[in-house]
From Swiss-Prot:
ATP binds at K251. Its main location: cytoplasm. A motif ('KMSKS' region) lies at residues 248-252. It holds the Pfam family tRNA-synt_1c. It is an enzyme of class 6 (ligase). This is Glutamate--tRNA ligase. Keywords: Aminoacyl-tRNA synthetase, ATP-binding, Cytoplasm, Ligase, Metal-binding, Nucleotide-binding, Protein biosynthesis, Zinc. Its EC number is 6.1.1.17. NCBIfam families: gltX_bact. Zn(2+) binds at C110, C112, C137, H139. Disulfide bonds: none annotated.
Length: 480
């Protein structure tokens, strides 16, 4: 029954998948994993990936949510060959198909009032029958098409819908369980389940990867596709993601928005690697490059069971990628964190140096940015615990002595500053810690930092000397 095709599809493409979010909120991690699985399956089979925005819920859909979804997909580097397509721009197409279905007896107008449908439902419930439409209007020709009505799909009454789910195996639903679905509302707008069918048909979708919450929609959609004479895609319904307490993942478990993970300082490679393993695996392997994911991914290896989100595992992966990815790439993502925090990095070390110094010490880029402010801007106060422990009267002499050594350096680098600290300790006949720890608190404001030689070299001579003076003044003011 296909009308003129609206898309110029490459006949040589044998696999075409889609990700079809509703723009009623952000891109959450469950949706991101679905998109990733769909994308990987297409890439594995040298196919195409379509992005479709299912925005038929006019009251809840927003341009901001659409922008957030696209931003999330781009951040995860899940590029699409086609789209984004918007269902609200295809209403003419949907109604063309509905009108032709009415002409061919595949669908019919229903003029039943809300009151009649309520009475029918109460009657069926009283008789312990499953509530369903009784086809009162199927052969009723007493109404004018101009009267308010919905359009219902004429669902088969006999037999079953059987499909082989790529994740869950064979699923069978009796047609007696299915109603005559409304496919066009009284206001003339097509309904979600119908739009999805026409889109998958028009866009040549061969494999539909989506959440298990869509399983009940599948038999209805298959029946409509069969009525249209359209090919049936392979369906794959992936399990839900739970929190580590076994409950459905929600905000109380922490971040659920993809872009919140960006904001919290995770690299996209870490989140993608984590999500791919959240329901799929290849032996005991934990770390996967993008190329390995594409080469190894198959829907048959996706678990039917719900997965538990573990933030500690994600942090472990994030640390791995912060260490292993090129420093300039990590630095580009780190730069976003500094901008978001309002930290001006113009006067300070190269961000690649920050990555080299702090990648081993930080779980996230956010933590890295927050713990490295002292490289770029002055601090007002010292960490209270660190100052109480190390900025005491006994620290004045080591600080004054090391300042003399540092001031006299002809070359300011990690090697020279290390020698200055070492020589100060030797001159005072004390351990390195008696010099290094007060110096660390003096120049960073905190009790923890990378090794002092690289820290001093990165902060710069002028700032270091001024901060030592500030620490000495702080100690003397306390003692006064």
């Amino acid at each position: 029954m296909k009308l003129e095709p609206l898309f110029d599809l490459d006949p040589n493409v044998t696999v075409r998948t889609r990700f079809a979010p509703s723009p009623t909120g952000y891109l959450h991690v469950g949706g991101a994993r679905t998109a990733l699985y769909s994308w990987l399956f297409a890439k594995h089979h040298h196919g195409e990936f379509v992005l479709r925005i299912e925005d038929t819920d006019l009251e809840r859909s927003t341009p901001e949510a659409t922008a957030a979804i696209i931003e999330g997909m781009e951040w995860l580097n899940l590029a699409w060959e086609h789209g984004p397509y918007f269902q609200t721009k295809r209403f003419t197409r949907y109604n063309q198909v509905i009108d032709q279905m009415i002409e061919q007896g595949l669908a019919y107008r229903c003029y039943c009032t809300k009151e009649r449908l309520e009475e029918l439902r109460h009657s069926q419930e009283a008789n312990k029958e499953k509530p369903r439409y009784d086809r009162h209007c199927l052969h009723d020709h007493s109404h004018s098409p101009d009267e308010p009505h919905v359009v219902r799909f004429k669902n088969p009454q006999e037999g079953s819908v059987i499909f082989d789910d790529a994740v869950r195996g064979r699923i069978e639903i009796s047609n007696s369980e299915l109603d005559d679905l409304i496919i066009r509302r009284t206001d003339g707008s097509p309904t979600y389940n119908f739009c999805v069918v026409v889109d998958d048909w028009d866009m040549g979708i061969t494999h539909v990867v989506r959440g298990e919450d869509h399983i009940n929609n599948t038999p209805r959609q298959i029946n409509i596709l069969n009525a249209l004479g359209a090919p049936i895609p392979t369906y794959a319904h992936v399990s839900m993601i739970n929190g580590d307490d076994g409950q459905k993942l929600s905000k109380r478990h922490g971040a659920v928005s993809v872009m919140q993970y960006r904001d919290d300082g995770y690299l996209p490679e870490a989140l993608v690697n984590y999500l791919v393993r959240l329901g799929w695996g290849h032996g005991d392997q934990e770390i996967f490059s993008r190329e390995e994911m594409i080469n190894l991914f198959e829907l048959e290896h996706v678990s039917k069971s719900a997965s538990a989100f573990n933030t500690e595992k994600l942090q472990w992966l994030n640390q791995h990628y912060m260490r292993e990815l090129p420093a300039d790439y990590v630095a580009n993502h780190l730069a976003w964190q500094y901008r978001d925090l309002g930290i001006d990095t113009a006067n300070g070390p190269a961000l690649t140096d920050i990555v080299s110094m702090l990648a081993e010490r930080s779980k996230t880029l956010r933590e890295m940015a927050l713990s490295s402010r002292y490289f770029f801007e002055e601090f007002e106060t010292f960490d209270e615990t660190a100052a109480k422990k190390h900025l005491k009267a006994a620290a004045v002499q080591p600080l004054e002595k090391v300042k003399e050594k540092l001031t006299a350096l002809s070359v300011w680098d990690a090697h020279s500053t290390h020698e200055a600290i070492e020589q100060t300790a030797a001159d005072l006949d004390v351990g390195m810690g008696k010099v290094g720890m007060p110096l660390r608190v003096a120049v960073t404001g905190a009790g923890q930092s990378p090794s002092m030689d690289v820290t001093l070299a990165a902060i710069g001579r002028e700032r270091v000397l001024a901060r030592i003076d500030k620490a000495i003044a702080f100690i003397k003011a306390k003692a006064a």
